[in-house]
Amino acid sequence: MGQKRQRDSKNLTLHSKKRKKAENATATDSDDGWDGIVGADELNWKEVALPDRLEDAGGFYGLEEIEGVDIVRGSGNGEVKFKAVAGKPKKSILKKKALEDENPEYEEEWSGFSDDDADRPENASSTVVEKPEKSDRKADKKSEKNADKKEAKDAKKKEAKAAKKEQKEKGSAIQRDMSINAGLSFAALQDTEEDDGADVSAWDSLGLSPEILTGLSKMKFGSPTSVQEACIPQILEGHDVIGKASTGSGKTLAFGIPILEHYLEKKRDDISAQKEQMSEKDSTPIALILSPTRELAHQLSKHIGELIAQAPGVNARIALLTGGLSVQKQQRLLSGADIVIGTPGRVWEILSTGQGLIRKMQQIKFLVVDEADRLLSEGHFKEVEEILNSLDRVEDGEVPDGEDQASEEESDPSSERQTLVFSATFHRDLQQKLAGKRKWTRGDIMDKKESMDYLLQKLNFREEKPKFIDMNPISQMADNLKEGIVECGAMEKDLFLYTLLLYHPKHRTLVFTNSISAVRRLTKLLQTLQLPALALHSSMAQKARLRSVERFSSPSSDPSTILIATDVAARGLDIKGIDLVIHYHAPRTADTYVHRSGRTARAGASGKSVIICGPDEMVGVVRLAAKVHANMANGKKLPLESLELDRRVVSRVKPRVSLASRITDANIAKEKISAEDNWLRNAAEDLGVEYDSEEFDESNGKGRGRGRGRHQKQKEVGSVSKAELAGLRAELKQLLSQRVNVGVSERYLTAGRVDIDALLRGEGNTSFLGPVDPLNF
């Protein structure tokens, strides 16, 4: 048997090139004294800034944080170490002292040759390693070249920087002179000559500045409204004001103009005292304007912004804080804002989570509460109370001991702040629900004493008795508003709504409902009937809400556009051209009716408000009329005008509405069934069980629980096939292609009462074939 040859022993000193390279790199790192792992005391910790409003920190004060490190746990002793994450410089996580201790050789780093080297003694210690003579000469020449290049480059940079700075100073000086002497600019004179503004001599009695008068002239506001004429002088004198005026009377500029006047006065004082302009981050707002809805906040910003854009020398910045938009962007806008406009929820969210923002807001000169009855009503807008409390709160230790009484008065946030309150309704009795069997009062809705007491309890006014300015003590509604009521059956509201819309072609119409589901259904119903309908409710995304308002208010849009909305559109929206307001559901409270109807007949224009009233809503409508028109001289039980629709028209359009309702209900039922099915399927997947829709429907139908009949009806409506839906749509399309015949022979048009010439020209109401009497209020 042959003996196996013995293998040579492996030389352990031989390693692969790759391993040698890694070991050399590790050795180099260890030689440098830096392995990237440090203790907690050597890190550059940063203190955590706590928000201004923190209810309970639980003892966590003085917290510190650091970013860009990984935790390295020790092998045996449990000690925790840290190291920089990949891609982050290791020096950035260390303290300066720790950095010097870890890298002492950085202090003696070679920085090139200098003239001091010649004077140094021969035996002096030097960290420069001696090189051969040839390499010294090369390095010397190279360093001289680099030094010359660097000097030339630095000289060029300095020259460019100086020229840029000089140019910037010249530009800022020119801009400053132009802003101060804006009225003397020839370009401004040329612009005013080209654009002839309105005559603003009627504003002279209010004592406004030339800049504001110029802006009002460009905006074509020739004379102030009654509420502006009454409120602006009182606000300019420094009084707290409670303004009560009908909707569409110009309340926005009644408080917007005094705020801008204060801004201009402050700007003049800064220029006369030759103060340096503060940076945006150091500036403090002069006014906070609170609004109950996002749409109203956007509108306030738009109206005040228009006056700022038209008034020369007024560069006030507006920060708009509303929900549905980026919080980070709004925080940046707030840092340099002069006027803050927002809804209570978002304003309080930003103030409570920020650092130093509440202290900034305590220095405002104006607090404006628009639509105050809604913002200050019980059970709504808890954030308003938080905002008001934070503005009036004086923290302990702010006024040091030994200060006199004057300094304590100056430290009171409300001592220098004017409070301005505006709305069309203040009486609390208007906020009671109209429906139900509870006892209701026939009180005067314009009771001044109750309104004053109610507001004095909620708000901290600077004066004991603020100025109460009531511009409509007799009638709560606008003068040019016509009110009417249409009585119908409980299941005929869709039919009468469509008929009312046919009676008012080329009218911009706003339809109010009491629920979001009704908005969705009515929008689809009217779109199925080929009417330009848009939706607006609180569940929509903010961008979609703004898009609906923009499309509805755009002058280039269809004049027959219809906006179906909940009460989010009831307050403050100033949309030009709204001719008709329809209450699909009777309003729950009287103040809601006042604000809904106030969307039309604004600024002296005429408008109509119609309630579609079912049998179950009649009691509430009677109470509504009694509250709103309590001071009417005629003493009628129901002062609303009863409107009678032509029964021929109602019967002719009924097939259209029936077909459209079937199509709409089928589509909604299909969407709802699909959504529920998807939810159940996802829930079954999460639970890890098998989902069978048919088995689930069988088990669901066996019970006798609540909603069983509704689910069964929904399933039946949603079971309509696509072919059946297509047939219904084709039938509806044929009906919509024809005019509604109101008793005219289509074969012998000339024999009837039809105006053929007007028919060919497309004049009159093109929805009907034949004469139809308009609705008389």
Swiss-Prot record:
<comment type="similarity">
    <text>Belongs to the DEAD box helicase family. DDX24/MAK5 subfamily.</text>
</comment>
<feature type="domain" description="Helicase C-terminal">
    <location>
        <begin position="496"/>
        <end position="646"/>
    </location>
</feature>
<dbReference type="InterPro" id="IPR011545">
    <property type="entry name" value="DEAD/DEAH_box_helicase_dom"/>
</dbReference>
<dbReference type="InterPro" id="IPR027417">
    <property type="entry name" value="P-loop_NTPase"/>
</dbReference>
<keyword id="KW-0547">Nucleotide-binding</keyword>
<dbReference type="GO" id="GO:0003723">
    <property type="term" value="F:RNA binding"/>
</dbReference>
<dbReference type="InterPro" id="IPR001650">
    <property type="entry name" value="Helicase_C-like"/>
</dbReference>
<dbReference type="InterPro" id="IPR014014">
    <property type="entry name" value="RNA_helicase_DEAD_Q_motif"/>
</dbReference>
<feature type="compositionally biased region" description="Acidic residues">
    <location>
        <begin position="101"/>
        <end position="119"/>
    </location>
</feature>
<feature type="short sequence motif" description="Q motif">
    <location>
        <begin position="201"/>
        <end position="229"/>
    </location>
</feature>
<feature type="compositionally biased region" description="Basic residues">
    <location>
        <begin position="703"/>
        <end position="713"/>
    </location>
</feature>
<feature type="compositionally biased region" description="Basic and acidic residues">
    <location>
        <begin position="130"/>
        <end position="171"/>
    </location>
</feature>
<protein>
    <recommendedName>
        <fullName>ATP-dependent RNA helicase mak5</fullName>
        <ecNumber>3.6.4.13</ecNumber>
    </recommendedName>
</protein>
<dbReference type="GO" id="GO:0005730">
    <property type="term" value="C:nucleolus"/>
</dbReference>
<feature type="compositionally biased region" description="Basic and acidic residues">
    <location>
        <begin position="1"/>
        <end position="10"/>
    </location>
</feature>
<feature type="domain" description="Helicase ATP-binding">
    <location>
        <begin position="232"/>
        <end position="444"/>
    </location>
</feature>
<feature type="region of interest" description="Disordered">
    <location>
        <begin position="392"/>
        <end position="417"/>
    </location>
</feature>
<dbReference type="GO" id="GO:0005524">
    <property type="term" value="F:ATP binding"/>
</dbReference>
<dbReference type="Pfam" id="PF00270">
    <property type="entry name" value="DEAD"/>
</dbReference>
<feature type="region of interest" description="Disordered">
    <location>
        <begin position="92"/>
        <end position="176"/>
    </location>
</feature>
<comment type="function">
    <text>ATP-binding RNA helicase involved in the biogenesis of 60S ribosomal subunits and is required for the normal formation of 25S and 5.8S rRNAs.</text>
</comment>
<feature type="compositionally biased region" description="Acidic residues">
    <location>
        <begin position="395"/>
        <end position="413"/>
    </location>
</feature>
<keyword id="KW-0067">ATP-binding</keyword>
<feature type="short sequence motif" description="DEAD box">
    <location>
        <begin position="370"/>
        <end position="373"/>
    </location>
</feature>
<feature type="region of interest" description="Disordered">
    <location>
        <begin position="1"/>
        <end position="38"/>
    </location>
</feature>
<keyword id="KW-0378">Hydrolase</keyword>
<keyword id="KW-0698">rRNA processing</keyword>
<keyword id="KW-0539">Nucleus</keyword>
<dbReference type="GO" id="GO:0016887">
    <property type="term" value="F:ATP hydrolysis activity"/>
</dbReference>
<feature type="binding site">
    <location>
        <begin position="245"/>
        <end position="252"/>
    </location>
    <ligand>
        <name>ATP</name>
    </ligand>
</feature>
<feature type="region of interest" description="Disordered">
    <location>
        <begin position="692"/>
        <end position="720"/>
    </location>
</feature>
<dbReference type="Pfam" id="PF00271">
    <property type="entry name" value="Helicase_C"/>
</dbReference>
<keyword id="KW-0347">Helicase</keyword>
<dbReference type="InterPro" id="IPR014001">
    <property type="entry name" value="Helicase_ATP-bd"/>
</dbReference>
<dbReference type="GO" id="GO:0006364">
    <property type="term" value="P:rRNA processing"/>
</dbReference>
<dbReference type="GO" id="GO:0003724">
    <property type="term" value="F:RNA helicase activity"/>
</dbReference>
<dbReference type="InterPro" id="IPR000629">
    <property type="entry name" value="RNA-helicase_DEAD-box_CS"/>
</dbReference>
<keyword id="KW-0690">Ribosome biogenesis</keyword>
<keyword id="KW-0694">RNA-binding</keyword>
